[in-house]
Amino acid sequence: MSSSPLSKKRRVSGPDPKPGSNCSPAQSALSEVSSVPTNGMAKNGSEADIDESLYSRQLYVLGHEAMKMLQTSSVLVSGLRGLGVEIAKNIILGGVKAVTLHDQGTTQWADLSSQFYLREEDIGKNRAEVSQPRLAELNSYVPVTAYTGPLVEDFLSSFQVVVLTNSPLEAQLRVGEFCHSRGIKLVVADTRGLFGQLFCDFGEEMVLTDSNGEQPLSAMVSMVTKDNPGVVTCLDEARHGFETGDFVSFSEVQGMIQLNGCQPMEIKVLGPYTFSICDTSNFSDYIRGGIVSQVKVPKKISFKSLPASLVEPDFVMTDFAKYSRPAQLHIGFQALHQFCALHNQPPRPRNEEDATELVGLAQAVNARSPPSVKQNSLDEDLIRKLAYVAAGDLAPINAFIGGLAAQEVMKACSGKFMPIMQWLYFDALECLPEDKEALTEEKCLPRQNRYDGQVAVFGSDFQEKLSKQKYFLVGAGAIGCELLKNFAMIGLGCGEGGEVVVTDMDTIEKSNLNRQFLFRPWDVTKLKSDTAAAAVRQMNPYIQVTSHQNRVGPDTERIYDDDFFQNLDGVANALDNIDARMYMDRRCVYYRKPLLESGTLGTKGNVQVVIPFLTESYSSSQDPPEKSIPICTLKNFPNAIEHTLQWARDEFEGLFKQPAENVNQYLTDSKFVERTLRLAGTQPLEVLEAVQRSLVLQRPQTWGDCVTWACHHWHTQYCNNIRQLLHNFPPDQLTSSGAPFWSGPKRCPHPLTFDVNNTLHLDYVMAAANLFAQTYGLTGSQDRAAVASLLQSVQVPEFTPKSGVKIHVSDQELQSANASVDDSRLEELKATLPSPDKLPGFKMYPIDFEKDDDSNFHMDFIVAASNLRAENYDISPADRHKSKLIAGKIIPAIATTTAAVVGLVCLELYKVVQGHQQLDSYKNGFLNLALPFFGFSEPLAAPRHQYYNQEWTLWDRFEVQGLQPNGEEMTLKQFLDYFKTEHKLEITMLSQGVSMLYSFFMPAAKLKERLDQPMTEIVSRVSKRKLGRHVRALVLELCCNDESGEDVEVPYVRYTIR
């Protein structure tokens, strides 16, 4: 995949949007010429520079306005241990104006447990000074400086946001009071072993521009009553999705025109398709039509200062199963600060004397607390556990709390998303051994090595076990990079016999650098897996990491074979598609290995843990399929920009990829035509017509021919086809029931007139002509003036709409029409195609769509094609940025979510390595940092099935030895008899993959032939594939009857052949 040069920037956005509007002009208005970049295409202009090629995926989360506000905010991060460096990393990647690192302490052994930018040779050096150059590499747009002096008021005054980590309560209160009085936003973050704490104070009056980050909803109106209040009814194609308290605006309403362009109005939801608005009793009568759109209205929120909030706290829940815990930990953390002040150190790990003292201090804090904080009964067991682990420093806890804290910093800078109001407490006590007696003070003593912060919590035996683990990490993108960092910090596979194997076939692109933090600008075009492996060796030189570049799937099962999987202790997925996830899930179920699964989408993230014989698998539950756009909507009746963008993507494939591929196959494969004629419906006609067009009717000889073709195609799509559609269905057409045909979701189009001086029209011709030329190996041009001159001489044929042209109104109509094919037309086409031997050496060059290269004309074509069609149908156009999101199917992403999610994954990893056996020890997690929302649940148990008295789950199977003691392989008859005698099951159908090996309705002759054949021979014959030497066993699926003839569900068969 190609990528843009690192220095290239786009100027984006424009003047401030209207108050109450959620979209910038760049989102709502068509891109126009202000500067012409290297490929001659027009772009938007603006005052603020945002490097879109770097921040692309994050911009889809935050938006341009929030991003500009980030770029004007200077942030102080105080405390550069594991938590501080995590927060600093995330906000530097995020692109704030500048970051100052503050720490007066020096590197200790325990810091290396989670501070990934400190090394053994740094012990004794200042943490901020050592970390500064390594953090500065993350983003060349963000100056990073180190400061080792005291936090005096003059110094603090120069920042918009101050972050305190691992700081004493006394310092927090002093800084908090000062920041609140000066309008400086404050985030306080702390981690203590398996516990985390977060506090936010963003001032007396903060303007929140968007509380949830979701795209504003819109719906089509079918009725508005004249009433007080008026009731709006939406078309029943889909629920409106609004909530009471939302604000909406109206457009395109016919009749009740007072609604169009009115100020945003608050609504009350009455049902899934109805809601009430203002008093409409004096408005005109509603006739038809209209679009109602949600409007994000800014609102003001207020925060208490840290001293005030300490005695009157508000909590955000992280786990509803621990409802009373935040209030208890609010007391516990205050007591812990007192203990540290008294002893100049936290309680010693697992030390009973220190734990008892902390409980006493907590009781005293509770006793003098005001009623709003005071607990009726202090959870002494919880406080004792806090004492046991408070000296610990765990990378996964720091990743989770650090991801959250960094997102809060971004909220403070931008006013985007709802902040944490105001305290958050988190714990992961389920990570402790299920055997309560397993840990002793002796086992948790510091060893003066890099894992001391972790040994303090889990003991030295567990550290040894971690070092010997063998793990397979699939993917080295954003989640993969974070997982590798955490693996290195916790010591996974870092000892003798341990190993982490990471595979990823992708190379690094510039847009990756914003969140895949192991990569640097100079790594662009290098392999991800190799680069990531080299980077984590810098973090922990002891990690045994091996990098591969293989795609996981049936094609690589000779590499990731039985031996490979049987040697593993577990698998972690870091994938970006469902198919690969489900494949790895099947492999883990087959080899009975734990699987750690996770994913992110913008500020949303999820974690799932799959444990053999205990939980369901990843594939046990699936999301409902995405709703596809009906073909007729795309072809004739679009009503949303998503429709025109999908149409443009289909155009790209149908013009610049599929015809070239078909031509090349026609020229090189003698059976191509024969194969094509066997395709269903009208496909043979469409394919052969495209080949004829490419080789005969439209084959260009010069660049001028390509410009002519592009101009003609423009007229076909944006003028002639629309005129034909309006000929079939005039604007005043009525349906059989007397209703207007062009109403509801059907928008009446109008044809466009080509104008060489219209930037968008020229954009289209430039992009289409260059891409068309590329498919023929001709040289294109980026000279807009020269192309405009060529267009003056292009003769456009006259078009007259024809009668008798069938235009399908529904997909059902289209499908029934597709059933009939004109055979005489097919014969005519075959006769007119030139013989391949008359075109020696000729080939075409199919183009694969690549969204991230701004110089290749791909997105230029998509934007122009989509926006011209949008103009046909009076649909609001989309700028390049939004078009790329939708047409490129980009997954919005931000470093903060990835860090937090991977922190949760690695907490589950602690449990997996220890071998936790209780289902309620594990936690599947879901979070949305924008809301903020956190939800945890124990994984679902594997569903249980039964035949006879035998219970089984997806983890069970029949083990059948194919090779008999005499060295001969089992025949099909022996296999069927084996199940009858051993399991009292009569097999009615038997399959391997998609190959049917046996069925009760099989023809007698075929059955007789197969019964005496060895099983592997039947598999090879039916599948027409030879079994590879790496295949030691086959997976066979059965349909069975029990002795009473009833159909019973049974496990699969693992049939061993070597």
From Swiss-Prot:
Keywords: Acetylation, ATP-binding, Cytoplasm, Ligase, Mitochondrion, Nucleotide-binding, Nucleus, Phosphoprotein, Repeat, Ubl conjugation, Ubl conjugation pathway
Pfam families referenced in this protein's UniProt entry, alphabetically: E1_4HB, E1_FCCH, E1_UFD, ThiF, UBA_E1_SCCH
UniProt repeat feature Sequence, residue ranges: 63-199, 459-611
Principal cellular location given in the protein's record: cytoplasm
Cross-referenced InterPro entries: E1_4HB, E1_FCCH, E1_FCCH_sf, ThiF/MoeB/HesA, ThiF_NAD_FAD-bd, Ub-activating_enz_E1_C, Ub-E1_IAD_1, UBA_E1_C_sf
Reaction(s) the record says it catalyses: ATP + ubiquitin + [E1 ubiquitin-activating enzyme]-L-cysteine = AMP + diphosphate + S-ubiquitinyl-[E1 ubiquitin-activating enzyme]-L-cysteine
Annotated stretches, region: 2 approximate repeats: 63-611
Active site per database record: C632
Gene induction: May be modulated by the thyroid hormone receptor.
Modified-residue entries (N-acetylserine), positions: S2
Complex formation: Monomer. Interacts with GAN (via BTB domain).
Misc. remarks from the entry: There are two active sites within the E1 molecule, allowing it to accommodate two ubiquitin moieties at a time, with a new ubiquitin forming an adenylate intermediate as the previous one is transferred to the thiol site.
Protein name: Ubiquitin-like modifier-activating enzyme 1
